[in-house]
Every structure is written in C-alpha cells, then in structure tokens.
C-alpha cells in the first residue's frame, strides 16, 4: 500500500510540475486542394424526337426550342458542344448564344465564359431539312453536350 501511495504522490507531483517544465511549441503547415473542373448539362425541356410534318417538308425547315440547366465549377466557364446527326438536315441554325450559329455536318464547340454556378440555357433550333426527307418522326438531329474548359 505504501508503494501505491508513493506512486500516486509521484504522478501528482509530475502532473502539477509538467506545465512549468513544458516548453512552448508551434507548428504551421499549408493545405492545398485541387478541385477538378466539372460540368453537368441537364435537358429541362427538349423533345426526345423531331416530328416532321408535310407542311415542314413543303416549307423546307422545322423549328424547336429547348431549355437546359448547366452547372459548372470552372472559373473560366465551360465548353458547349453541338454535334449534328447526318442525313436529316442540310444545316442547323442555333439561337440563344452570344451570336446565331449556322452549322452543317461538322460539330461545333462554343466557349461559354462565366463564373461558376448553375445557369439556365434556352436555345432555339431551326433545322433546314434535306430535300429527301419525308414526313415522320426522327431522332433529334442534334446532340447538345457540355464539358470543362
């Protein structure tokens, strides 16, 4: 029992003396993180297919509107990709960007500058129909996509 009391007395003496004996130490470090650029494009209102009527064929074109939600975290903006599907159209006119675009069979990429955030993108498309097109339902002749810069 005497040994236990001595051990407790020693521990108490060290515990109360420790702050007086302890030196002050400081440390600093830098933390950095790399956040990969990310873009998501969601169709809010876009037809799943293109319905071409006899009046559209006679007129030579048909029009649709589409609305998308674009969310990105890049400080410089994002890249909007417009990828036409061949065969149904001669050209596609795209309105709703900084300028009206007219595209043929080749894809177009458009830099969309702006701060990070979530934005609504409203586009209008005029599809100039190929002369061989007949009335009917077709897959949408344009794929809209977005990716980081």
Per-region residue spans from a language model:
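Short, surface-exposed beta-strand/strand-loop-strand elements in extracellular ectodomains
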Residues: 89-101
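Bacterial N-terminal signal peptides
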Residues: 6-17
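N-terminal small/polar-rich segments of proteins
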Residues: 21-88, 106-149
């Amino acid at each position: 029992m005497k040994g236990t009391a001595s051990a407790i007395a020693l521990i108490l003496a060290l515990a109360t003396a420790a702050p007086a004996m302890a030196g002050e130490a400081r440390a600093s470090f830098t933390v950095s993180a790399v956040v990969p650029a990310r873009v998501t494009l969601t169709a809010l209102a876009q037809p799943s297919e293109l319905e071409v009527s006899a009046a559209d064929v006679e007129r030579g074109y048909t029009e649709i509107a589409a609305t998308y939600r674009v969310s990105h975290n890049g400080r410089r903006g994002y890249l909007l990709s417009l990828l036409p599907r061949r065969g149904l159209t001669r050209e596609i006119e795209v309105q709703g960007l900084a300028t009206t675009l007219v595209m043929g069979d080749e894809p177009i990429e458009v830099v969309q500058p702006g701060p990070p955030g979530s934005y609504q993108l409203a586009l209008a498309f005029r599809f100039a129909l190929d002369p061989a097109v007949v009335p009917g339902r077709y897959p949408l002749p344009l794929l809209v996509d977005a990716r980081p810069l």
